Amino acid sequence: MENNLENLTIGVFAKAAGVNVETIRFYQRKGLLLEPDKPYGSIRRYGEADVTRVRFVKSAQRLGFSLDEIAELLRLEDGTHCEEASSLAEHKLKDVREKMADLARMEAVLSELVCACHARRGNVSCPLIASLQGGASLAGSAMP
């Protein structure tokens, strides 16, 4: 299949791109993928460039780019706008680092709460539940 990616029906195209047909239609509605002309009395056909474009979208999504950001990257895809693409990637990297810092804070708080749960004795209420109910400030410190 890899060696002949021209003149594909939407089902074969979706399979070649590693997505389902509804994803193809969704990308078309969002303007991420052009809908090919439909010859009179026939069906639309897709080619290798379409497969490449969908793979681009999926790769960008795996890196955390939103569909709007991907649309902007696609606008720059001729390769001559490296500075603009780099700027978008730097912004995404900043977002990822902020999320990682938030996750590290959440991990620290949850770890502390789990330890507190294991250390509790007797009829003392659960520190995790108490924290989530506002009885302690630990849970609040996990979120920015």
Swiss-Prot record:
<dbReference type="InterPro" id="IPR047057">
    <property type="entry name" value="MerR_fam"/>
</dbReference>
<keyword id="KW-0476">Mercury</keyword>
<keyword id="KW-0814">Transposable element</keyword>
<keyword id="KW-0475">Mercuric resistance</keyword>
<dbReference type="InterPro" id="IPR011794">
    <property type="entry name" value="MerR"/>
</dbReference>
<feature type="DNA-binding region" description="H-T-H motif">
    <location>
        <begin position="10"/>
        <end position="29"/>
    </location>
</feature>
<keyword id="KW-0678">Repressor</keyword>
<dbReference type="GO" id="GO:0045340">
    <property type="term" value="F:mercury ion binding"/>
</dbReference>
<keyword id="KW-0804">Transcription</keyword>
<dbReference type="Pfam" id="PF09278">
    <property type="entry name" value="MerR-DNA-bind"/>
</dbReference>
<keyword id="KW-0238">DNA-binding</keyword>
<dbReference type="InterPro" id="IPR000551">
    <property type="entry name" value="MerR-type_HTH_dom"/>
</dbReference>
<dbReference type="Pfam" id="PF00376">
    <property type="entry name" value="MerR"/>
</dbReference>
<feature type="binding site">
    <location>
        <position position="117"/>
    </location>
    <ligand>
        <name>Hg(2+)</name>
    </ligand>
</feature>
<dbReference type="GO" id="GO:0046689">
    <property type="term" value="P:response to mercury ion"/>
</dbReference>
<comment type="function">
    <text>Mediates the mercuric-dependent induction of mercury resistance operon. In the absence of mercury MerR represses transcription by binding tightly to the mer operator region; when mercury is present the dimeric complex binds a single ion and becomes a potent transcriptional activator, while remaining bound to the mer site.</text>
</comment>
<feature type="binding site">
    <location>
        <position position="126"/>
    </location>
    <ligand>
        <name>Hg(2+)</name>
    </ligand>
</feature>
<feature type="domain" description="HTH merR-type">
    <location>
        <begin position="7"/>
        <end position="76"/>
    </location>
</feature>
<keyword id="KW-0614">Plasmid</keyword>
<dbReference type="GO" id="GO:0003700">
    <property type="term" value="F:DNA-binding transcription factor activity"/>
</dbReference>
<dbReference type="GO" id="GO:0003677">
    <property type="term" value="F:DNA binding"/>
</dbReference>
<keyword id="KW-0010">Activator</keyword>
<keyword id="KW-0805">Transcription regulation</keyword>
<keyword id="KW-0479">Metal-binding</keyword>
<protein>
    <recommendedName>
        <fullName>Mercuric resistance operon regulatory protein</fullName>
    </recommendedName>
</protein>
<dbReference type="InterPro" id="IPR015358">
    <property type="entry name" value="Tscrpt_reg_MerR_DNA-bd"/>
</dbReference>
<feature type="binding site">
    <location>
        <position position="82"/>
    </location>
    <ligand>
        <name>Hg(2+)</name>
    </ligand>
</feature>
<dbReference type="InterPro" id="IPR009061">
    <property type="entry name" value="DNA-bd_dom_put_sf"/>
</dbReference>
